[in-house]
């Protein structure tokens, strides 16, 4: 059973893209292991050339300096029934066939509905013009590029790295030294969650899991 952040190779996206699709790729954020090192934040910025002011993943400390202090890495969770996808009035947000949530920046109108709908606060709206799109939503792509031509200059500019198409995992999970971030094939990631929960005697530490993947 996988016990690290290196799960089995990502399944290729097959079949049509659509409004919703089952989550075949998942994130597991283990708050019992996060040490707030910031490695995921730096790796994401470097891998995707994310400009200043944008954080596709961020580490938040809850109850800092108090009993029960908890560190939480917050990416886009690419939810099974993503509320951001449901509320987008122009269908700029959609699920790929593998369940990864993408945004078409040529379609996005910057209305902000997705930000209000997201339980994780993942959507961001830069006031400047990174990626050449003023006010258009940006978020974690699971290092899967975007709807643009894979590996094209346009994809790199608008969406960033496409590690998934290369058979690699998101950079944040790849560099996590404590394996607090686990990413990859849904079944394998779920096995890690179950194993850690069983070892602890509870699901403590499985931040956001039940919200993002309610049937798992």
Language model segments and positions:
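Non-ligating segments of multi-cofactor redox enzymes
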Residues: 1-216
């Amino acid at each position: 059973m996988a016990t690290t952040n290196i799960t089995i190779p990502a399944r290729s996206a097959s079949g049509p893209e659509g409004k919703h699709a089952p989550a075949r790729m998942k994130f597991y954020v283990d708050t019992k292991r996060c040490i707030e090192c910031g490695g995921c934040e730096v790796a994401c910025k470097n891998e995707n050339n994310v400009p200043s002011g944008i954080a596709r993943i961020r580490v938040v400390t809850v109850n800092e300096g108090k009993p029960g202090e908890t560190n939480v890495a917050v990416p886009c969770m690419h939810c099974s029934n993503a509320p951001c996808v449901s509320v987008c009035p122009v269908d700029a947000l959609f699920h790929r066939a593998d369940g990864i949530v993408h945004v078409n920046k040529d379609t996005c109108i910057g209305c902000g509905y997705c930000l209000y709908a997201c339980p994780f606060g993942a959507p961001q709206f830069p006031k400047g013009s990174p990626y050449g799109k003023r006010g258009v939503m940006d978020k974690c792509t699971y290092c899967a590029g975007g709807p643009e031509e894979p590996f094209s200059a346009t994809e790199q500019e608008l969406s960033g790295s496409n590690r998934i198409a290369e058979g690699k995992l998101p950079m944040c999970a790849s560099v996590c030294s404590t394996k607090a971030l686990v990413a990859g094939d849904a079944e394998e990631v779920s096995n890690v969650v179950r194993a850690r929960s069983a070892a602890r005697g509870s699901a403590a530490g499985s931040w956001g899991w039940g919200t993002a993947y309610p049937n798992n």
